[in-house]
């Protein structure tokens, strides 16, 4: 299915890249000393779904084939171990040459002198092709410290049979027709009343490190986490209170399972497959796993996130970065360019069901391996993320804010902390993080 240029670029951005499959030259085999055991080896550390792991393995092999004598040491680790491992290795001087990092965490590394400045390694033909807001997300003080590798976003998957049983006959088929918060509430109430038993209306994907996805609701009210200086808190506002009160009502109205709270260990895709919820907010990268889990047991479709004064979504996806410790910096940078070359990015996105970050690929006929009929919904939803949203989520101290959101939202949703105290707690934490 084609992903239109208008859809993916309209929100995020306000030449084609060089293709490296047929031979990657220009790097030196005599790079500086560092963590790798060989200057002809690229160590690449990442987490990965099964589909992503397959794509990474295939592309690593292709890079080796294109560069005689070069080895890619691909190290796939669980997401929960990824950044504690990277941090320990950076401290000990044994960091991988290249690693994967999500956009909200990017600023933590780019601001600390731990990553390779890619200014002299990326030409304008490539950098001009990146979706501007995503390229902005990998920069610090105007310099690029990574390459946007892919992006993903959240939409709602739902079970038509459950909707039919609850008497819900109309589902949004465009961003313009997306449910308002009031309409979404009515749908949730109807599902709760009609389905009965142990089936609940939905679950949201804000668990653990996904706590930042709560900001979607804040942005939809027209609110902000940070002022325009990107350091001062802006969340103590009528918009902040509205977003917090609405999302707290998910628990008060028993629309979502309690074990899917922000610090919960149960994720929406898991219980959607088990048919314990009618709807699940999920990222497009989960479509292969959902399809494998559901098989032909029931029909499932996708629709858009609800909206308030505006539509919004989360900044999903990941960048690839090279470390300052890389044993051969030129080779590490060449590997990054290879991974985001147009043909390679396209094949990776197709296999893992993710969205490209190159403008030249937006609108191309990407042959998605799983549920290509649903991908355009996610692509259109991704256009609702603005450059201002991205700027607030990619500050150097956002990693601390994400932990803060986990704590404060859990206190509000589960432990009875007031909306006012929660907003104040987030604001105080933002001030501490920005000042630290």
Task: List each model region and its residues.
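Short, solvent-exposed loop/beta-turn-alpha elements that line the ligand-binding surface or hinge
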Residues: 119-130, 173-177, 200-204, 223-242, ...
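Hinge/lid segment of periplasmic solute-binding proteins
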Residues: 103-155, 217, 299-303, 367-373, ...
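Conserved N-terminal structural module of periplasmic/extracytoplasmic solute-binding proteins
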Residues: 1-108, 124-127, 170, 307-310, ...
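Short helix-initiation/N-cap motifs at beta->coil->alpha
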Residues: 76-85, 104, 178-183, 260-273
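Extracytoplasmic/periplasmic solute-binding protein
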Residues: 27, 143-149, 154, 180-233, ...
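Glycine-centered hinge/linker elements that transmit conformational signals in sensory
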Residues: 187-189, 229-261, 305
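Extracytoplasmic/periplasmic substrate-recognition and gating elements
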Residues: 61, 65-66, 166, 252-255, ...
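Long, aromatic- and glycine/proline-rich binding clefts that accommodate carbohydrate-like moieties
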Residues: 296, 300-303, 350-403
